[in-house]
């Protein structure tokens, strides 16, 4: 769900049914979003959904995240893996218990446990999630309106969806402007606008190149990389701050 915009999960689910693959939703950007009226993370169309609570996300626990699933079997497996693959559940053990202290490592897990302090930080923000996302959507709608007529494309929102609006990404119409993508990015940064580029296509990274992937292999991802710019969007953003972003974009592009 890139940038918070829900994918067309019914179509992805249909493909999963046809070809027999599991579906894991990456909802790192999409907390607070909805698809066909239901919250992202209810796993109606997937096996697992993962959320990130990294510091830059809409809700943060400083680090960590959450996994949701409707499968008791997957939930039990996740519970095991999050704590070194260690269990005190006798039904999962291979040997008889030696006593009240006994445990067994039955799988190769890791320490994925969030601390209670981190969890408390996250819980304290959940009551405000609706307001956070509503404010981001209002700011995004204002961007949509005030950026009209400029040589760029604003984000789409598919029918029957409600975006978490983690990011607001514009795509430059390169053939309609006199500067390059990089020049536009640099000029916005020089003028104090905190733009970024989310993200570099993963198949162009050195690790994946070693697997045989090459830069000209995924045209849409590469086209996106060559014209996308993320502009500032945060729930505490004021209209005056947003107006400044828009003013500078106009000055750079027109």
Each language-model region and where it sits:
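Active-site phosphate-binding strand-loop segment of PLP-dependent enzymes
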Residues: 1-61, 66-74, 230, 234
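PLP-dependent aminotransferase class I/II
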Residues: 5-12, 18, 34, 72-254
């Amino acid at each position: 769900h890139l940038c918070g915009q829900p994918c067309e999960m019914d179509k992805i689910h249909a493909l999963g049914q046809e070809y027999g693959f599991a579906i894991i939703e990456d909802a790192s950007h999409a907390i607070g979003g909805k698809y066909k009226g239901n919250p992202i993370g209810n796993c109606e169309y997937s096996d697992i959904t993962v959320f990130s609570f990294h510091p830059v996300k809409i809700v943060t626990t400083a680090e960590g995240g959450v996994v949701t699933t409707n499968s008791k079997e997957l939930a039990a497996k996740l519970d095991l893996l999050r704590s070194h693959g260690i269990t005190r559940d006798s039904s999962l053990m291979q040997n008889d218990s030696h006593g009240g202290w006994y445990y067994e490592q039955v799988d190769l897990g890791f320490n994925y446990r969030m601390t209670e302090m981190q969890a408390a930080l996250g819980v304290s923000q959940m009551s405000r999630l609706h307001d956070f996302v509503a404010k981001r959507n209002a700011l995004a709608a204002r961007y949509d309106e005030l950026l009209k007529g400029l040589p760029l494309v604003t984000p789409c929102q598919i029918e029957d969806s409600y975006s978490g609006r983690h990011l607001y990404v514009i795509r430059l119409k390169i053939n309609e402007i006199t500067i390059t993508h990089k020049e536009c990015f640099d000029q916005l940064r020089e003028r104090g606008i905190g733009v970024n580029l989310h993200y570099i296509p993963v198949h162009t990274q050195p690790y994946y190149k070693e697997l045989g992937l090459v830069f000209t292999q995924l045209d849409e991802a590469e086209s996106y990389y060559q014209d996308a710019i993320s502009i500032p969007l945060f729930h505490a953003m004021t209209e005056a701050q947003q107006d400044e972003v828009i003013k500078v974009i106009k000055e750079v592009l027109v």
